[in-house]
């Protein structure tokens, strides 16, 4: 897998500075700059780190490409929480790291679900259920008997998660019955996907990915480039393909049956002028 790393040095002075050396989609860092700054402030404040009597020099690096849809913001928040924990010997367990990262994610999402920071904190294949009340979210680590070969396509477009979420919320308020029906189908789809993952049934997983993408189109989360990349993936052998993350840009993932197909999808997408890479899930 790919990672974001963070390093914190303590020097004389007060406040903090940041040096962001992460590889990124062109324009991503510029568009997300205000959110990055606020997320750092959120994490520092949550962990009650003193910046009145000392100055923090924060740096981010790693091989995870910062792009919409890959969980880059969560990786940044989680890596910062871990670096602060190490630098100041805060003795935080993963649950506390996750809580700090969630506070950072609020700068990007307004009201984040918590899934991205949870995936970033714990890693692996995760079953996540958000608690819509005041209780805790549910998180289980799953084991699939089969590795999932994924081709990731980058649209090169950076969308604002906050704006997309606000648009969808407005549409839901305008047409609650339509959205309740879609969300009901969504719940069934996710339960079916969990069963298929536990069996390693990639044919079913691929079919469910395709259905999921159609739902995302219905709620206006997908964009033209997302749809184009989904079609390219399917035309070149993907069992299933869908956007991932914010949508209206960002990334598309395609599920391949074997490494040769995975390679083919990536190569064709690159020939079309987009960046693409390979990963494995499970």
Residue ranges and their predicted role:
Residues 66-68:
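Helix-loop-helix module between adjacent transmembrane segments
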Residues 94-95:
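A sequence/structural signal of beta-propeller blade repeats
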Residues 79-82:
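Alpha-helical metal-binding/catalytic segments enriched in His/Glu/Asp
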Residues 55-57:
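Residues at or immediately flanking beta-strands
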Residues 73, 245:
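Short, conserved phosphate/pyrophosphate- and ester-handling motifs at nucleotide-, phospho-/glycolipid
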Residues 3-52, 61, 84-90, 99-110, ...:
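C-terminal nucleotide
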Residues 247-249:
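Glycine-rich nucleotide-binding loop
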